[in-house]
Amino acid sequence: MANPPVTEWKQSEAIPAHVAQETGCFTTLPIRIHKNNSIADQATLESINDWKQHLDDGWESRSGSAISKVGNWCSFIFSEALPERLPCITYLANIGNIHDDATEDATLDEAITSHAQFSTALSLDTDDEPSLQEAKTRRFRHLVSNCVLEILSIDRDMGTRMIVSYQKKWLDVMEHLNYEGIESLEEYLEFRMLNGGMEPFWLMCQFGMGLNIPDAELAPTRHIFEPAEWALVLTNDYWSWGREYNASLTKGSRIVNSIELLSRLRNISYDEAKEVVRDLITTYEAEYERRVQDFLRENPSTQMYLRQFIEVAGLVVAGNHYWCANCPRHHAWKEQDQAVHAVDQLEEFPAVEAQSPSSATHTAAPQEDPPVTEAPSPISSPSSSSSAKPSSSSAADSSSCTSTSQHSPSETDSTPPSSLHLLKSPHPVDAPCTYMSSLPSKGVRSTLIHALNQWFQISSRNVTLIKEITSMLHNSSLILDDIQDQSPLRRGKPAAHTIFSTAQSINSSTYLFVRAMQMVSENFESSVQMSFLEILQRMHIGQSYDLHWRFHLQCPTEDEYFEMVDAKTGCMFEMLLLLMSSKSRHVKDHSFTSFIRTFGRYFQVRDDYMNLTSGEYTAGKGWCEDLDEGKLSYPLIECQKMAPASFTQIMGIFRAKQADTAQLSDETKKYVIELFRKSGVLDSTLDWIMEMERQLLMEVKRLEGVMGDSNPMLYVLLQTLSLNQ
């Protein structure tokens, strides 16, 4: 650069340019490697061993490892990561590499399914795709759960942002664009920005550096990152070309590479196209440098952390280039038909400890690619046709109000003959339920089912069935709750009864109970049916006490409150436990009673607390909606014990509210919240929640001992719900 960066790099050390050039590397940018390369190597080996343990499909040894004789890939691309954060992002990056390699030889449909399974395993707060093969998804989930848990424990806000982007902006889109339809280099680069997951990659860099820069603050710098990303894409294409071309000849693998594209579009040889790509790489590197200089000159007061992140992009480009020029991942095919196993690589290249670049061996010269002077007709796998589409046939393809044919094959035969058109679906009774199912969900029940299935190991069909039954009951209860609470909002959208009428919504809600019971009777033994009905009975009794206390302004004791919670909230979790254990050959539910009861109580009190304090809840349900309802929640019970005078005032507000259907004014709500805060009620409630979180962690440890198997996904669920900032 004309004006070299003044950033002080703390975690990395320089690789001399002449050392890099001796290996064939031609980047024009400065190269740095993390001082703790051994940390990255260890995390890489753990990811390889874990892949073998949980998936055991051979790709842990067939995939080219991040380890190389010049250093670990992640030591170059995360060269300024904090040492304590380097292991988890290295682990996640290498798992992504193995997964990417494993899908290269798959058909397009198979690749999309595999990406969806991996994406589902990373899901933190949404219901996943029920048509996926449960066993494969479960193995993916067990593979990544410990890594996800570590990420969230280090930095939950940035970790969540990073993981969601990794899931939504890479795995969910990487195979959904048609490479064969691309007609220009610009389209190709845009395609690879999604296919290569650039957004989640930069978030991983931020996480590693301990940053969490808002998108709005980064937006003015977006143009700087573009040429860096283009150089990254073309660098990978340049050095992976020989491997990809060889795989297309020997295995019929798909080629997705700018060299093939330029050869095809410009009618030039592969060798000529490769030279074009080489020139473009250095051109884009120079453009990146120019844009950095211009931005810093025009914005001299740029915050140091933002400047550092901008300049790290150049280190990423250069470090990735140096690694690509030397890594077994791109070059081992020249000596054998698969990459060297990472353990063997470590033995051959023992430079796993941090060392001075001058003392390391950086002299290996690259071998030439296969001589190809003219481009033959493009080689493509039959699976890469643009007409290929993922198949999706499952119980979740239609509304849970109506998707029952797979559970009742004789339903049509058993229906009494009738000429009435009204008996044919869809019915008006389905509409409120379909609407509720379309609203965003936190997905706690779904995540809990999948986490427990690590132990229960029931089939994919039964997982889908149980999710559908519990979803019906949950949606039914939400429809009724909104009516009983006179709530105008549900998950940030209009409540069902405000759209379909109160009468129709009540009818739809009760119909869902009937449908759920019908599905249970068709798929479970009579003893399970009886237990299911008993749980439904307790759920309604629990709800009746909640309504009774509210109407009569009768504040329960803490013991009475939790008895109500065990019935109203806990029974839903108890129900999924009943259904899962009845389909499992490995587990019965008696060992889980304490965990489920504690989880139900924790979930309800957490909900009570968040309703009064969370901006997220305000967006979904309205501000302090429990106060509008006059709900006798846990904080109010605490207030009765801790501040009787404040309790009397709040009950007076609720009593006056009963004669007025309007919502409480913002001023009144602020006053009530201030009473809670000054009396220590909110702090006391949060302390109780923290104690329940500790108890739940102890319960999971106990269950792991009983089951003889760890369950990191349960820890991830508890971490995502945790209020321990």
UniProtKB/Swiss-Prot annotation:
Domain of life: Eukaryota
Protein name, per record: Sesterterpene synthase btcA
Role: Bifunctional terpene synthase; part of the gene cluster that mediates the biosynthesis of betaestacins. The bifunctional terpene synthase btcA converts isopentenyl diphosphate (IPP) and dimethylallyl diphosphate (DMAPP) into the sesterterpene betaestacin I. The C-terminal prenyltransferase (PT) domain of btcA catalyzes formation of GFPP, whereas the N-terminal terpene cyclase (TC) domain catalyzes the cyclization of GFPP into betaestacin I. The cytochrome P450 monooxygenase btcB is then responsible for the six-step oxidation of betaestacin I to yield betaestacin II.
Oligomer and partners: Hexamer.
GO molecular function: lyase activity; metal ion binding; prenyltransferase activity
Entry-linked PROSITE patterns: POLYPRENYL_SYNTHASE_1, POLYPRENYL_SYNTHASE_2
A biological-process GO annotation: mycotoxin biosynthetic process
Binding residue positions for Mg(2+) 3: D481, D485
Residues bound to Mg(2+) 2: D100
Required cofactor names: Mg(2+)
Keywords attached to this entry: Isoprene biosynthesis, Lyase, Magnesium, Metal-binding, Multifunctional enzyme, Repeat, Transferase
Residues noted as binding Mg(2+) 1 in the record, renumbered to the chain: D100
Annotated family: In the N-terminal section; belongs to the terpene synthase family.
Annotated Mg(2+) 4 binding sites: D481, D485
EC number(s) per entry: 4.2.3.-, 2.5.1.29, 2.5.1.81
